[in-house]
Amino acid sequence: MASDGVVTVYGDGAITDTKVSSYAVKVGLAQMLRGGVIMDVVNAEQARIAEEAGATAVMALERVPADIRAQGGVARMSDPGLIKEIKSAVTIPVMAKARIGHFVEAQILEAIGIDYIDESEVLTPADDXHHINKHNFRIPFVCGCRNLGEALRRIAEGAAMIRTKGEAGTGNVIEAVRHVRSVLGDIRKLQSLDDDEVFAFAKQIAAPYELVRQTKQLGRLPVVNFAAGGVATPADAALMMQLGCDGVFVGSGVFKSGDPARRARAIVQAVTHYNDPHILAEVSCSLGEAMVGINLKDEKVERYAERSE
């Protein structure tokens, strides 16, 4: 067992420390979502559509990221009443977003019985210097990252699940691809280093040494790593799975499309059968119009992924 609350998720051995044991439980809960699709929903009807399509969880929101981009202003935690309404409509786990650093929003979400909390850069950050201490909560947190250093810093704070940041609400998968390639590329580089070089690498990426060492041993992140931010089609979802992700978040891509129920089912099938081009071709047919995407080369587009490190 590594020190500083590090849990060898994919290894064996008894866990005796209470705090570490609690974290291990949260990591285990996050692993239960592995291989699945998590969909953004704004009402009970959409939540039921997502569940019927085979989603492993839903993210309860007042506005999907595409609407947050279009409408601007300050994006905050959703109304707890809406979240409870969505939670009562489905049997699958329900997630909700809290602003970065806003531990009181997280306390409220925990109090209403939410299953997972996403400390999300999609919402307007409440603290530009500190993230939530996620070890203070009983329920699992998911956090975004652009690279291995960010991922391991969030895990050190208590995140039980990592996702790419991508660029939510754009329907453009390029940043999600960039982020997952960065994380996996750094892990491959890490595995080629000798033990002495690992210290310098940990310092270089500003991550705790014990987590860096554990990642080298595992050959992967010590928690599940999902794709998020710009996934809009079954092909996008399968691409992220083939690149090495453990599952996929789909935000605006489903309910901003021409046939949400059909597209939701297709994306779930694409994640399940991501290595079978014949099934991918079949589920990609006749889905209706995809959401209108945003060109990220436009300098006017706000980069949510840059809101925290």
Swiss-Prot record:
Q: Which residues bind D-ribose 5-phosphate?
A: D40, G169, G230, G251, S252
Q: What is its EC number?
A: 4.3.3.6
Q: Which reaction does it catalyse?
A: aldehydo-D-ribose 5-phosphate + D-glyceraldehyde 3-phosphate + L-glutamine = pyridoxal 5'-phosphate + L-glutamate + phosphate + 3 H2O + H(+)
Pathway in which the depicted protein is active: Cofactor biosynthesis; pyridoxal 5'-phosphate biosynthesis
Q: Which residues form the active site?
A: K97
One Pfam entry for this protein is SOR_SNZ
* The keyword Lyase is assigned to this record: yes
Q: Which GO terms describe its molecular function?
A: pyridoxal 5'-phosphate synthase (glutamine hydrolysing) activity
Question: SUPFAM superfamilies, from UniProt?
Answer: Ribulose-phoshate binding barrel
A GO BP entry is: pyridoxal phosphate biosynthetic process
Top-level EC class, please? lyase
Positions bound to D-glyceraldehyde 3-phosphate: R181
What the entry lists under InterPro entries is as follows: Aldolase_TIM, PdxS/SNZ, PdxS/SNZ_N, RibuloseP-bd_barrel
Keywords per UniProt: Lyase, Pyridoxal phosphate, Schiff base
Q: Does the keyword Lyase apply?
A: yes
Miscellaneous comment: Vitamin B6 is an essential quencher of singlet oxygen in plants, that can protect cellular membranes from lipid peroxidation.
Q: What HAMAP family does its record include?
A: PdxS (MF_01824)
Q: Which family, according to the similarity comment?
A: Belongs to the PdxS/SNZ family.
Q: What does this protein do?
A: Catalyzes the formation of pyridoxal 5'-phosphate from ribose 5-phosphate (RBP), glyceraldehyde 3-phosphate (G3P) and ammonia. The ammonia is provided by PDX2. Can also use ribulose 5-phosphate and dihydroxyacetone phosphate as substrates, resulting from enzyme-catalyzed isomerization of RBP and G3P, respectively. Also plays an indirect role in resistance to singlet oxygen-generating photosensitizers.
Recorded hits in PANTHER family, A to Z, give: PYRIDOXAL 5'-PHOSPHATE SYNTHASE SUBUNIT SNZ1-RELATED
Give the protein name, as stated in the record: Probable pyridoxal 5'-phosphate synthase subunit PDX1
Q: What taxonomic lineage is listed for the species of origin? A: Eukaryota, Viridiplantae, Streptophyta, Embryophyta, Tracheophyta
